[in-house]
Each structure stands twice: as C-alpha cells, then as structure tokens.
C-alpha cells in the first residue's frame, strides 16, 4: 500500500434546498405510453400504473376503468371508440382488456390465458389485436420478456390466443396502410415485416446514431435504434436512439439491407430530421402520418412534420433573400426554427396520510450535523415529519401526547440518514410496472431511500 498527496480542483457544490410541502395529493412526474386518438382530440396514457384519458389540450384527466389491477400500454382502436390495454397483478398475472369510451363502465377482458402481455396493437380493420405474450417466470425473476416470448393475435371480441411467431428480439408490432403484414422492430435487425403466419420476413431499414463513450482505447460502434416505427401513411419511419427521436425517409432503393446513420442529420445518406431537443420517450405516429408524439417527464410533445419542413424552407428563403450562405446558421435562426408543441399533463392521486407520534429511542444516531454522533439517541416523529433528534433522556414529550405515543426500542442499533444513490441499478421492469419490486426493497434494506 502507498499514499499519494495530490490537489484536485473541484467545481462548486451542487446543493439545492427543495421545499417538501405536505399536500393532500401527489402530482405524477411522468406519463407513460401516451397515445393520441385517431382524430387527435383525446389522449390516453399511463400514470401511477393506471390508464387515464383526457381531452386535448387542457381537459381534466379521468380514469379509464375502475379495475384494481396495474394497467398499461393503452392503444386506440381505428374508430377511436375503444381502447385496448394490458393489466398486471402479482397474484393473477396479466391479461388484455378493452374499454369503450362511448359507453361508461363497459370493460371487457379479451384473453382467456393469464400471462405477461405487452405491446398490444389493433390492425387497421379493427377486428384483431396483435401483442406479445411472455413467460411469467422470466418476468417474475428478471422483469424482462425473456427469450421465449411469442408474437400472437386475438379477435377484438375476445377468445383464444393465436400464435404468429417467436419474437426473437423483435417488439413494437404495428401496421401501416393495410393489415396484410405486421411490422416489427429489433435493435439488431432494425425495421422488418412478416406475414400473419410468421413467414416471409422482409428487412426494411436499420437506423444508427452516435457512438457513445465506451472503454479507453476501444471505439464503440454506432448506437442502434431502440425501436423503429414506420409511418402509417408515408414512406417515413421514426427511430428512437439514446432517448432522442428522429424521423427518416425510406427511399425506394431495392436494397435488402438499407441503413442510415443520423449522428449528423445534415450529412445522412437520405433525408433525416431530429425531433427532440432534450430527449423524448414513448414516440408514436399520429393517424395521418403528419405528427409524431412523444413525452418527456409529464409533458406531451406534438411535432408536426409538414409545418417543420415549411419553417425550414422559410428560413432558407430568408437567407437567400439576404444573400446569406445556407451554412451560416446563427442563434437567431435557431430561435426561429420549429419546436414541438408541448402540453403539460397534470395527474394527481390522493396521498396516504401518515398520522401519529413515534419515538425511536436508545439508538446510536449518525446525524447530518457535521461529524456528530449521538450514542444513546432518539428520534421523535410526528405524522410524517422528524420533529426532534437528540439524546434519549432529553427528548421532551408533552403529557397529553403520551397516550398516543408509540415507542420502539432500538438498543444496539444504528440510525443513519437515508442514502442517495445517483447511479442505482434497481433493475425494475420497464414496460409493465409491478406493485411489488424486490430491487427497491433490497436497496431500502441497505439504507438507500433515494435513487436516480
């Protein structure tokens, strides 16, 4: 062993005192799987593991159903009158349901087999739903769909599951102008399509982005698209790469392995456009193929491609009128360039209220007051607030509070402030959230109360 004396410059401490307000409600910080209705007037999305619908842009969110299961991945029928979605329950497993938005409380379970369902999508006629069904065991143990997941379909009226093909890493099934072929996406093979019997796979397009930092001395390959979805009306596709959303033109080339790199969209091999400034999630097409919707946090973004193209042409025309070169893009031009329209989606649920008086006594307390350690200390908690920390025999409790006081003797134990892990790998299931997540409990057991 050896020691080295070294001076290292540090930047300013990033510390913010955020107020924590006791309110009756909790505001959701994220909307998931947002889907806009075919006519563009309504939004269905997942928040707090329940599906909500609202009128755009400023309607009040309402629960779609009164089910007690976890809900997710809503998708509109072609008519816009029904929404299909998946459910999950720790005991009963998952299913696919549909709900009518024109007939109140009309909810129907479509699947007979319990399992792990995801990525439901209607065909263009509206008489079938295609989806992925995965292993219950893989989902329980790893939170993933697993290698044995299957692509299947079911009648929109309900019934038996019908096998199409193994997913083989493919996901995000979708349809375009007709329902003759099912389009799929995978990180390794990009966008492809198959027939309803799983045959005649046609590889259409691969999209890659920047090369992220890897290992010193070893160059990382370009990042593949997380998923690619073809436009329902046009020869375009959206691609999500490293949480940024792009739209690329699909040229008719006759090539079997068509690929494009969008790390610099101005130099891409065929037209491409970056839609996001700070990133985006859960990207999807509008029914007309003119709009791409995505979310970030609790905001929904609507990117209108024809308007964006028109704005670009106007900026170029202004440059030519002013005898400027096309390459001379200044801050003023960037400020004038098209930006996706943003709507903040505010979803609230009632907060569980914690009431009572608890004394944790006779513990060794490592405080946040410098290096102070209280060997025989106590923590007094009222409702959901720590009101006093000090030596056990110095904690003052009013006589009127003694009857409601709950005391916990922690002799031989140590109380520490909760740890913040800013690079936690909690391994949660990404698409279907569980009510009970063992990785959260394991982190909490080791004192981690905040993760990022």
Stretches with model-predicted labels:
Residues 1-9, 26-29, 44-52, 56-57, ...:
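A flexible loop/linker signature enriched in serine peptidases of the S9 family
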Residues 10-31, 267-276:
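A short helix->beta-strand "capping" segment at the edge of beta-propeller domains
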Residues 208-224, 264-284:
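Conserved blade-ending motifs and adjacent loop-strand segments that build the rim/top face
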Residues 310-354:
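Non-catalytic propeptide/linker segments at domain boundaries
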Residues 371-416:
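Histidine-rich, glycine-flanked metal-binding segment
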Residues 413-452:
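Metal-associated gating/positioning segment near the N- to mid-region
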